[in-house]
UniProtKB/Swiss-Prot annotation:
Its EC number is 2.5.1.72. Iminosuccinate binds at residues 24, 41, 112-114, 129, 199-201, 216. GO terms for biological process: 'de novo' NAD biosynthetic process from L-aspartate. It is found in: Cytoplasm. GO terms for cellular component: cytoplasm. The keyword Ligase does not apply. [4Fe-4S] cluster binds at residues 86, 173, 259. Catalyzes the condensation of iminoaspartate with dihydroxyacetone phosphate to form quinolinate. It comes from Thermococcus gammatolerans (strain DSM 15229 / JCM 11827 / EJ3). This is Quinolinate synthase. Keywords: 4Fe-4S, Cytoplasm, Iron, Iron-sulfur, Metal-binding, Pyridine nucleotide biosynthesis, Transferase.
């Protein structure tokens, strides 16, 4: 099926199923183009609370689809590809959290939304890269258990002055770990007039050399402040920014900064997902109930 026919079939099935497509900023350009709603993790979570459609097709990775299901237990949530997983989310096991709680019984558990529903069920509050600093600042504790991203945790510690206990000790995003100081220096040489926008999942030494440190939603807000940017995050963010601001120049810091899990979602898989109503996302009720409290607390605090 050619692309135009595929898109027409998707639109037809969306109408028949009363479905919407929610997509993350790291999706393939052709998936971004057909999304009803496009955003970062926080924006997608906020949107998921107020969805009118009966079916949500989630063009993102598994933990994002789980969050949508937790917030909409009565709706059908579809993840078009079983391989749309997040390696970092899988690094955090419940036992890591329980062990940290034994060592720091009074410390609140703050979990990045890039975590499983099972892990979120043990959290006091969840955060995204967009609101982590704001939420940790509001917590009445100078010590927090934070996971799974160590780099986001160190950024939060640096900005808030609070002590962050990372769980697991070396949780990370393999895409953002690719970026190095050499990439920063190369970007400065190649694009001398550009500023650097860096995601807080990048290594601290990369963050320290940035002009701004921001979530993907933050990058969108900051972009109009300058006319040329090098983007230190997943490469598809350059497409998203370029569409929003056609008169501003954006360059990927690395062409190989690719999230394989995100790229598992294609137009074909979205079409098949709507056609066959697969793959349905389910979260056990007890886990969903506990995880929902942590997610809703995040939405209230941000």
């Amino acid at each position: 099926m050619d692309r135009e026919k595929l898109i027409a079939e998707i639109e037809k099935l969306k109408e028949e199923r009363n479905a919407i497509i929610m997509a993350h900023n790291y999706q393939l350009p052709e998936v971004q183009d057909i999304a009803d709603f496009l955003g970062d993790s926080l924006e997608l979570a906020r949107k998921a609370v107020n969805v009118d459609a009966e079916v949500i097709v989630f063009a993102g990775v598994d933990f994002m689809a789980e969050t949508a299901k937790i917030l909409n237990p009565e709706k059908t949530v579809l993840l078009p590809a079983k391989t749309a997983t997040c390696a970092m989310a899988n690094m955090l096991q419940v036992e890591h959290i329980l062990e940290a709680k034994r060592r720091y019984p009074n410390a609140p558990v703050v979990l990045y939304v890039n975590s499983s529903a099972e892990a979120k069920a043990h959290a006091d509050v969840t955060v995204t890269s967009a609101n982590a600093v704001k939420i940790v600042e509001k917590l009445d504790s100078n010590v927090v258990i934070f996971g799974p991203d160590k780099n986001l945790g160190s950024y939060v510690a640096r900005v808030t002055g609070k002590r962050v206990i990372p769980v697991p000790p070396d949780g990370h995003c393999y895409v953002h770990r690719k970026f190095t100081v050499e990439d920063v220096e190369r970007a400065r040489r190649r694009y001398p007039n550009a500023k650097l926008m860096v995601h807080p999942e990048c290594e601290p030494e990369v963050q320290e050399r940035a002009d701004i440190i921001a979530s993907t939603g933050g990058m969108i807000r900051h972009a109009p402040e300058w006319n040329e940017w090098v983007v230190f995050t997943e490469r598809e963010m350059v497409y998203r920014l370029s569409r929003l601001y056609p008169n501003i120049k954006f360059y990927p810091a690395r062409e190989d900064a690719v999230c394989v899990g995100m790229k598992a979602i294609t137009l074909e898989s979205i079409y098949e997902s709507l056609r066959d109503m697969k793959y349905r996302v389910e979260v056990p009720e007890e886990i969903a109930k506990k995880a929902k409290r942590a997610i809703e607390r995040m939405l209230e605090m941000s």
